[in-house]
Each structure stands twice: as C-alpha cells, then as structure tokens.
C-alpha cells in the first residue's frame, strides 16, 4: 500500500488506521482482523491507462461500498534522485548537521520541535493482537477453502474488472526478506514516511547521518526534518560542541535556572522536561498507572508532590513527565531505567517509544551540560541514560559476541580467541569498518576500547575481503601464534621482531653475535671508558638509555636528543645531565653501536647486538613488505617511532588497531601512534562484550575524570556484574608492582589451609629465585658457607666477591634499576622469613591457571587477558580522599600524574568480567565524579524512628518527620575492609549528593511554582 501526503492526512483522522500502521502490535484483541483493509492486496489485473492511480487511504475501510477506480486521481509522486549533498560527508568526528533554526526563547524552541507530534493525532494504546501460531513468518496465514456461489463469483469478477489496484509490496514490505525461491514484491521504499520515521528513530545517529541520509533524497529529508528526534540530534551536536547546540542548551539552562548559582537547579531540570509537548492521545493517568509497578515510583511521587505540587494539579502531561524524570534521577543503575522503559511500553501506556527516548535524551543533554558547567552532580545518572539508549539503538547486537568452547584454561581466563568466530554478530561500529575496503596508500585507524572485539573484527574483515592478502603484525609471539589459528588463509601472522630476524637477526645469530637479553647498565659499564665526572655505573646507565632511545627512534644517527635528561647521582638525587656528559654519552654510544653492527666484531668484548638492535638495522634498511594488499598493526598504541617508520614506508594500505588508553609501555620508547600518526579514515569500537554496566561505568569514569575523555564513552552489555564486594568464579589479584605481587602470594601461601596460586607469567619471569639469591647475598659470608647457600644468578653472584649486598643495593640506586630495587625491598622487609616464604610460594604455585584458587600478577602481565573477578590492589595512583572531606590534601592534582599511571588503572579495571573489588583509592576517584553509591529511599521503608547518621565522627540524627532519606550502600574493598554504609543526615548528604540534595530532603511544601 502506497501512502501519499494526502493519504497520511486522511490516515491521521482515523484512530484505527494510524494505530495499525505505527503500533501494529498494540491492537485491541478482537475476533475480527484488526488490520482489515491495511494488508497489501496483490493485483489480479492491470489496465494500461491507470498508472499512478492510488485511492485515498480511507477508501480501504469502506468495505460496504463498491469502489470505483478513476484514473489519474493522484499525481505521480516519484522523487527524482539528486546529487548527494557534501553536507553529509562521511567523517566520524565531523559535527552533526544543524537542522533546527535558532530561537531566542527556549520554550518556543521546545514547542516548535514537537509541533509535528502535537498537531498529529496520537497513537492508539490498545493491547496487542493475538498471534496465530500457524502463521508463516514470511507469508500469509494459511487460508481455508471457501465455497463460493457461482453468482458471487461473477460479481467478484466484475469488481476485479472495475477496480484498478496499484502494485504493492508483500505483507512485510521486504523488511524480513523473501524466500530464496520467491521474487521480491516490494521493499522498504514502499513504506510511508510516518513508518520510516518510527524505524529511523531507533538507529544510532552516526548511521542516520553517514548512511541513511545518503541513500536517497526522501530519506535525507526525513533525517534532516527539524521535527524528527530533535533532542537526540541536539544531544549529539552538544557532545561535539557545535556552536548552535551550545547556544541552544545555554538558553535552556538560563530559562529554567539550571545554573550553579541556583541551589535548586535540579528542580529546574524537572520543570524543563515537564514542558515537553505531548501528543493529545496520551493519557497521563494511564501512563502513571503503568509506572506504579516500578519500585522508584513511590519515591518519585513523594518528591514531586512535595517539591513541585503545582504540577500535580495540572490536567496535562507535566506531572507525568516530572514523575518520570524523578525516577530517572533516583535510578540506581542502568537496569532501573530499563525497567522504567519496560513499564512505559506496556499496552496500557499510550506513550510511543520515540516519546520516551526523546525525553531521556532531553534529560541526558541537561545532565551533561550541568557537568560541563561544573555543577556538582554525579556523572552516574547521565551514564545510565546513555548506556540504556545505546543498548536500545544497538539491540540486535547486545548479546555476547564470541561463543568459546569451554576448556580447563578458559574457565579461569578468557582472551577472546575462539574457533567460533563464524558465530560473531557484528555491531553497528564493526559493520562500518567492514563496509570500508582498504585501498593502497590509505591509513585506517580503529580506536578500540577494552574488550570490544578488535581481533574478531579483523578476522571478519579478512574473511569478507578474501581476494586481498593481509599481513597481521604484533609485538607478542604468543598473540601471533594464536592469530594463525583464527585468521583465514589470506592472512600472514608475524611479530615485528620475527620479520626483522628473518632479514637481519639470523645473520648475527649465525656469527654468535646475538644477545637475547636487553642492555644493562652493568654490562655497558665494561664497554666504556672510566672518565672524570659520572661514576662508571651511572654513565653505563645513561649510555644504555641513549642506545635504547636511538633504537626506538626513527633517526639514522645517534645524537644528543637520544641522551636522557635526568640521572641519579651517587646520593640518589635527580640531577640534570650536563651538555658535556651528553657529548660523552653520544660518543660512547656511537662506539658501542659501531661495534655491534660488525658481523666479524670482537665477541670477547661482548659487542653483541640485541633484538632491538637488529630491529633498528632492519628499519634503517628501508624494508618493503611486498606481496600484501594491507597490513594489520595490532596494539598500535605501543609502536615505537622506528616501527611506525617501517609501517608508513609501505605502499600498501595500513590498518592501525588498538586502544590509546592501554598504552603502558612508554618507558620502552613507545609513542601513542593512534594519536600521532595522520589517518585517512578513523573508526571506533566502544561497546565491550566483556562486562556489564557496573564495571563499564568504573572504566568510563577513569577515562572521564583522569583523562577528560567524554566524546566517546565505554559501554558494555547486559551482563550481570558487581563492584561493591561480590566475588564469582576465579579470583585474580592485580597490582601495579611485583612487590605487591610477592606480598599477596606470601599472604595466600601462608594460610593454614593450603591454597593453590598461580603467578601470571610464571615464577621464572617473576624472578622468585633471584629474590632468594639476593637474600643469600645479604647473609654474612660465614653463614652462607656454613649453610651451603649457593647463589645461582650470575649477575648477583658477581657481587659476592666484591661489595656484597651493600654494593648491590648501591648499584641499584645509582642506575635507578626499579626491578632490582623492588627485589631488594622485598628482602629487606621480610628478612629471615624469605626462605620460608619462597618455599611456601613454590609449593603452592601451580602451572595451570585452571587449577589455581587465586591468580596473582601485575597489570603488565595481565594485559590482553580477562578474568571473572578482579581485586584491584592499593599500590596504584593514590587519590587521597573524596571531595567532600575537608582534610583532603589540596596538592593532589589529576593532571600531575603521568598518563601511563591512569592507563594502568584503566587496564586493571577492564580485565574484570563479572565482579570488581575496588581499592579505597579507586572509590575516592569515583567520588571526584560525584559517585558516592547513594540511594534515595522512603523513610517508612527504611526506619520507623529516627536513627543516627552513619558517617564516622558525625553525631547528628535523622529527623523522624522526613519522607525521604538517603542511604550509603555497603561496600567491600579489595583489601578486605568493609564500609557498612547506612543512612545520612542532611549535612552529610549535602556534601556528597551535591545539586541532587533538594530532591531528597523536603523541608516545606511549595504552594506556588517558582517564577523565573
């Protein structure tokens, strides 16, 4: 059935017609067919002169009258295709086009935006019809044989001769496709604009502007209509800071007193939302009746009745919207808002989904603007709304992405490698990547948050473009080996060092000139001259750093830019490297590098080339990786400038994949390639399949508060999760340093009941035997000889005959060797307990992770992995205390901490799948975003009599006459300490709840609305 503009007007005058088209599932149950007259009718006869003939939509309901076809009644409304407007050019970071005219008065702006809805007849709110089980999904219900009288048959033939029926699509308008053996009889193009608007409203705004608006002129007009999803457009325009959006939102904030100068600005937000124009068919009382089943309804009702009583007396929808807004503000998480939306989708509710989503976008816009204006309000509410809307707009892909066959290893650790990648259901973001075919010379960036399926995206990309040849390169050998198992045959998986070894490194191995370990200050000290100035060990450190910086750079020669800026003197004090010392460092480094490069060099003096050294030689040879159409660079955020130079010198296409917030190897010379390298195309993966909203919120808040990332938000799926103390599955303890790893291992191994532990990476890599050797070195020589304590490590054994433990400690301080200093600290702390602890840790340690009760490790070792439950140690960045505490140290500034430290914390948090136990410092960090784990409850539900405030050192008591009370939820920290939570007094709430406080405390009724 085709609908013209006249048909839509006629349809708007019919409740049955409008509701059948826009809400086909919400029809009143009846014995008859509620869609009678609306189902497409297949033509039985065509008359040449009747092209363009279409009857008024109301004529299809006049079943009692004989229909007469009059050719040429309607004009041909076919739309001529136009050249695409560059206004809709594809650029993910480009601002969303302005489709709404600027208005000086925000109230009129809101009214104009909803004029299209307010002047149309509202939708029906009847119950959905009964589904027939025997109906075929793709076709019509099986029709029973009917005996027709011959005279009736003749009448039907005459009607067929007289009535001209225009070709129409199938009953589903092509939305469900067709059987393989059927010829399509229609498509989505045949749907009326009213239905297309309802469909388009559910799509992400990026798809609307970068895909749908480019299909045809008709769709572009729909998307660009200022009456079409105005708040959704405004929200995304405000996020990218379009001037028009900034002005409009600022006007709204001023008109409704949503500013920092107004203590009750949150009430202004509610008043603003309550003014949203609503369809006349919406019955506010029926909607409120649907909401009564929600646990937040009674709290919102008490709040609005006491704070904004004038809204309750109005007969319009203002009170309804105020209740909904209060419920959103009181929501404890994403699921509260999802339940709210479910209540509003009940048959008794006459609100459309678009009405609800537009309201949520309105609230989200105002909340986001409040934080931008530094108004004290938690970021949790905005995050909950954004998360809920994101899942709704991407509803077809919110299920877990990869189905992995369970193995003993996968039960405790998942790293998303799977042989079932054919089961992958692509997200909108992933599909956009697959829609782009890489060309020669293109540089494509894929900015992928933690757990967003970047590997499976690359696998599907290679499968789609099977005619192309790809090279997948990474830094980790194990990752490359796993890649060979999951990528199709047109992908070659290598590490950068393996490529360099095949070309350069193998030559040095054959000559015995390959050193598989890194340069150390100790080894370099034997290759340099003992000159006046720095001590031999300190200069060995600065020269080794100069070489490492040169290896990581893209430069061809060693220069002073590669020398370190700081060094530690013999007293452990940081000093600037003088120009003279820089000159000496360059001279010594050049001499070592010249001897390293010689294949026939002096092996006895140990001028052996390192792995980074032959990688540097390979880079300087300007290699060309021929035979590939494109290169996948995994973990691109960890690329050094030398590797970047190799990649960018290729003529084929390049796809850089990684998470810029997981760069934790800058100390090795890595640069954040995803920020520094120019690109031709950029895509984002923001939805993680690893965790649910609770853990996703913590990760997103770290990026928000610590790194200022707000334009792209990390979200997860619908999985259950917890961050307040629950534990499920295998427990993993992640820390910043190996010192804490040893402490945790010692505590667990020292328990009476034997506990099986596994240190991620293994005991050898952890260096447990070196710790034992350092303890042996710390013992007097006669004691070592008496107890037959033999030092096995060659480096530590060298100090046995020289300066002993004191000399080793002095060396570690001078060369600033963090790992060695950490091991010495362990020995000094545990002293004589070291042999016992080492023995217990070794006996408790198991090789297989699946056999362990606890997994222990550093973030660097756990990068790329995921675990059921993660405990965050308290050795990360120390955030002193929450912002409401007057004793907080004022010198703590977020920006003073290195970015790598925040990245480490972000990586640690995003390893968790189900449960996350936070440190107290991490809880304090969330408090900087206004999140204190508070909940508003009815006083009657909480306590019957007045109770004391649960805050320590607070002596106030809650008043017994108040209707609402704020409760701090209990929380267990990763170190085992418990915050029991409890009810808070007014002054304590005011410190923590910020601008939300007026909603929770009701001192007096406001009989009249506030005049602005």
Swiss-Prot record:
Residues 427-692 form the UvrD-like helicase ATP-binding domain. Residues 185-234 form the F-box domain. It is an enzyme of class 5 (isomerase). Residues 1-54 are annotated as: Disordered. It catalyses: Couples ATP hydrolysis with the unwinding of duplex DNA by translocating in the 3'-5' direction; ATP + H2O = ADP + phosphate + H(+). ATP binds at residues 448-455. Pfam families: F-box-like, UvrD-helicase, UvrD_C. It is found in: Nucleus; Chromosome. GO terms for biological process: DNA damage response; double-strand break repair via homologous recombination; negative regulation of double-strand break repair via homologous recombination; protein ubiquitination; replication fork processing. 3'-5' DNA helicase and substrate-recognition component of the SCF(FBH1) E3 ubiquitin ligase complex that plays a key role in response to stalled/damaged replication forks. Involved in genome maintenance by acting as an anti-recombinogenic helicase and preventing extensive strand exchange during homologous recombination: promotes RAD51 filament dissolution from stalled forks, thereby inhibiting homologous recombination and preventing excessive recombination. This is F-box DNA helicase 1. One of its GO terms (cellular component) is nucleus. The keyword Transmembrane helix does not apply. InterPro entries: DNA_helicase_UvrD-like_C (IPR014017), DNA_helicase_UvrD/REP (IPR000212), F-box-like_dom_sf (IPR036047), F-box_dom (IPR001810), P-loop_NTPase (IPR027417), UvrD-like_ATP-bd (IPR014016). Keywords: ATP-binding, Chromosome, DNA damage, DNA repair, DNA-binding, Helicase, Hydrolase, Isomerase, Nucleotide-binding, Nucleus, Ubl conjugation pathway. Part of the SCF (SKP1-CUL1-F-box) E3 ubiquitin-protein ligase complex SCF(FBH1). It comes from Gallus gallus (Chicken). PANTHER family: F-BOX DNA HELICASE 1 (PTHR11070:SF30), UVRD / RECB / PCRA DNA HELICASE FAMILY MEMBER (PTHR11070). SMART domains: FBOX. Residues 12-27 have a biased composition (Polar residues). Pathway: Protein modification; protein ubiquitination. Its EC number is 5.6.2.4. Belongs to the helicase family. UvrD subfamily.
């Amino acid at each position: 059935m085709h609908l013209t503009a006249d048909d839509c007007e006629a349809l708007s005058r019919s409740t049955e017609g409008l509701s059948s088209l826009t809400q086909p599932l919400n029809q009143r149950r009846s014995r008859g067919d509620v869609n009678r007259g609306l189902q497409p009718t297949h033509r039985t006869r065509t008359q040449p002169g009747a092209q363009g003939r279409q009857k008024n939509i109301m004529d299809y309901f006049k079943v009692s009258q004989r229909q007469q076809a009059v050719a040429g009644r309607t004009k041909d409304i076919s739309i001529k295709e136009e050249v695409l407007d560059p206004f809709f050019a594809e650029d993910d970071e480009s601002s969303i086009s302005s489709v709404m005219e600027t208005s000086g008065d925000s109230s009129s702006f809101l009214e104009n935006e909803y004029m299209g809805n307010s002047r149309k007849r509202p939708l029906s709110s009847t119950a959905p019809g009964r589904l027939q089980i025997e109906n075929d999904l793709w076709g019509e219900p099986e029709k029973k044989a009917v005996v027709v009288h011959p005279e009736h048959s003749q009448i039907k033939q005459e009607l067929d001769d007289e009535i001209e029926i225009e070709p129409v699509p199938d009953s589903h308008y092509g939305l469900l496709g067709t059987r393989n053996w059927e010829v399509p009889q229609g498509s989505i193009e045949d749907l009326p604009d009213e239905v297309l608007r309802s469909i388009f409203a559910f799509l992400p705004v990026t798809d609307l502007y970068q895909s749908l608006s480019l299909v045809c002129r008709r769709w572009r007009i729909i998307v660009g209509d200022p009456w079409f999803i105005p708040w959704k457009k405004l929200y995304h325009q405000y996020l990218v800071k379009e001037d028009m959006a900034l002005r409009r939102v600022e006007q709204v904030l001023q008109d409704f007193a949503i500013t920092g100068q107004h203590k009750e600005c949150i009430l202004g937000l509610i008043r603003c939302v309550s003014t949203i124009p609503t369809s006349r068919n919406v019955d506010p009382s029926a909607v409120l009746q649907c909401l009564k089943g929600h646990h937040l309804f009674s709290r919102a009702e008490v709040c609005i009745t006491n704070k904004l009583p004038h809204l309750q007396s109005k007969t319009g929808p203002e009170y309804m919207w105020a209740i909904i807004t209060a419920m959103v503000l009181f929501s404890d998480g994403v699921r509260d808002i999802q339940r709210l939306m479910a209540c509003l989708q009940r048959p008794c509710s006459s609100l459309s989904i678009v009405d609800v989503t537009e309201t949520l976008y309105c609230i989200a816009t105002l909340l986001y603007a409040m934080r931008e204006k530094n108004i004290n309000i938690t970021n949790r509410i905005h995050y909950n709304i954004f998360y809920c809307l994101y899942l709704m707009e991407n509803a077809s892909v919110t299920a877990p992405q990869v189905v992995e066959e369970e193995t003993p290893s996968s039960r405790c650790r998942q790293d998303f490698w799977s042989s079932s990648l054919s089961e992958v259901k692509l997200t909108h973001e992933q599909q956009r990547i697959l829609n782009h075919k890489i060309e020669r010379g293109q540089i494509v960036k894929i900015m992928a948050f933690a757990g967003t399926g970047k590997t499976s995206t690359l696998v599907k990309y290679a499968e789609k473009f099977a005619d192309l040849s790809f090279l997948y390169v990474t830094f980790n050998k194990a990752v490359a080996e796993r890649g060979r198992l999951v990528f199709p045959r047109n992908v070659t998986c290598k590490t950068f060092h393996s490529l360099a070894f095949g070309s350069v490194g193998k030559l040095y191995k054959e000559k015995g000139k390959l050193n598989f370990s890194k340069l150390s200050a100790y080894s370099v000290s034997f290759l340099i001259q003992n000159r006046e100035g720095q001590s031999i060990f300190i200069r060995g450190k600065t020269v080794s750093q100069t070489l490492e910086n040169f290896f990581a750079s893209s430069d061809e020669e060693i220069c002073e830019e590669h020398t370190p800026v700081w060094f530690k003197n013999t007293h452990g004090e940081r000093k600037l490297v003088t120009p003279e010392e820089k000159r000496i460092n360059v001279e010594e480094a050049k001499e070592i590098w010249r001897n390293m490069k010689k294949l026939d060099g002096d092996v006895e003096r140990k001028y052996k080339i390192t792995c980074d050294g032959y990688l540097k030689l390979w880079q300087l040879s300007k290699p060309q990786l021929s035979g590939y159409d494109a290169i996948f660079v995994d973990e691109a955020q960890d690329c050094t400038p030398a590797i970047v130079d190799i990649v960018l010198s290729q003529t084929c296409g390049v796809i850089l994949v990684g998470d810029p917030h997981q760069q934790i190897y800058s100390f090795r010379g890595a640069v954040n390639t995803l920020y520094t390298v120019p690109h031709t195309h950029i895509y984002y993966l923001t939805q993680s399949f690893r965790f649910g909203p609770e853990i996703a919120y913590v990760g997103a808040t770290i990026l928000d508060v610590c790194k200022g990332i707000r334009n792209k938000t990390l979200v997860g799926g619908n999985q259950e999760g917890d961050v307040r103390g629950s534990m499920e599955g295998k427990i993993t303890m992640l820390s910043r340093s190996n010192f804490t790893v040893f402490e945790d291992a010692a505590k667990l191994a020292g328990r009476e009941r034997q506990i099986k532990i596994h240190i991620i990476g293994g005991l050898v890599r952890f260096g447990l035997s070196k710790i034992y050797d350092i303890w042996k070195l710390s013992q007097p020589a006669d004691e070592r000889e008496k107890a037959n304590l033999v030092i096995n490590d060659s480096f530590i054994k060298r100090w046995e005959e020289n300066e002993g433990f004191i000399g080793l400690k002095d060396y570690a301080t001078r060369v600033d060797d963090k790992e060695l200093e950490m091991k010495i600290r362990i020995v000094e702390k545990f002293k004589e307990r070291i042999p016992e602890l080492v023995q217990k840790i070794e006996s408790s340690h198991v090789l297989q992770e699946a056999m362990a009760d606890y997994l222990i490790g550093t973030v660097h070792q756990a990068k790329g992995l995921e675990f059921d439950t993660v405990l965050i140690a308290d050795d990360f960045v120390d955030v002193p205390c929450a912002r409401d505490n007057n004793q907080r140290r004022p010198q703590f500034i977020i920006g003073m901490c290195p970015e790598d430290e925040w990245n480490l914390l972000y990586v640690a948090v995003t390893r968790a799948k189900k449960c996350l136990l936070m440190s107290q410092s991490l809880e304090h960090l969330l408090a900087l975003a206004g999140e204190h784990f508070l909940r508003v409850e009815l006083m009657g539900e909480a306590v019957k009599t007045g109770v004391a405030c649960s805050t320590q050192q607070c002596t106030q008591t809650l008043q017994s006459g108040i209707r609402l009370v704020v409760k701090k939820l209990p929380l267990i920290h990763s170190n085992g300490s418990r915050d029991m939570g409890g009810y808070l007094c007014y002054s304590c709430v005011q410190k923590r709840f910020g601008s939300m406080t007026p909603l929770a405390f009701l001192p007096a009724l406001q009989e009249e609305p506030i005049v602005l």
